[in-house]
Amino acid sequence: MSLQRTGEVHRVTKETNVTVRLGLDGKGKCKISTGVAFLDHMLQQLSSHGLFDLEVIAKGDTHIDDHHTNEDVGIAIGQALSESLGERQGINRFGHFSAPLDEALVQVVLDCSGRPHLSYGLNIPSQRIGSYETELVKEFFIAVVNNSGLTLHIRQLDGTNSHHIVEACFKAFARALRLATELDPRRGDAIPSSKGVLEQAGSKPKQI
């Protein structure tokens, strides 16, 4: 199977201008500039540990706060992920990984099911990491999930340092997503579902 598994999204609102290019079968090349330094750092982890080629360029109303940029980047990444997966033929579909960072340990389990759901279990001690409000971590993943059709479970197993907890989360997410989106040679071009279809909830049903 020779699929071009890439997605590109250009999203413009009165609050932000976001461009995302995502390649699932990459080598971890990344170009990230969102105007939100900590978010940039986390997206670099996503690219590096998922081996995704990822470009994210965003300009937003960060003079107000980081909320709109953070959310709209998550939306665009989710849409690019959905586009790059297409009908999700031949993928493993499921992925899980537990990532440590010093005292922090975070587990991520996900399913490229087409059924958006987030179960979020991070307990981040501080309200900010640098200038980044830590409540935005959940908002980022909500945006990704709702626009990609992922079922995503995030569990904090240990950790006291806020930076370590969030970074371990993004690393675990990257590795779990890599496992789930990789192609299974035994499956060929079949869709990994007993129904014969995987699609995002609310989309038009396909004939099979």
From Swiss-Prot:
Pathway, per record: Amino-acid biosynthesis; L-histidine biosynthesis; L-histidine from 5-phospho-alpha-D-ribose 1-diphosphate: step 6/9
Primary subcellular site in the record, as a coarse category: cytoplasm
Keyword Thylakoid among record annotations: no
Enzyme kind, highest EC tier: lyase
This protein's GO CC annotations: cytoplasm
Keyword entries, A-Z: Amino-acid biosynthesis, Cytoplasm, Histidine biosynthesis, Lyase
Reactions this protein catalyses: D-erythro-1-(imidazol-4-yl)glycerol 3-phosphate = 3-(imidazol-4-yl)-2-oxopropyl phosphate + H2O
Location in the cell: Cytoplasm
Family: Belongs to the imidazoleglycerol-phosphate dehydratase family.
Protein name per UniProt: Imidazoleglycerol-phosphate dehydratase
Phylogenetic classification of the source organism: Bacteria, Bacillati, Cyanobacteriota, Cyanophyceae, Synechococcales
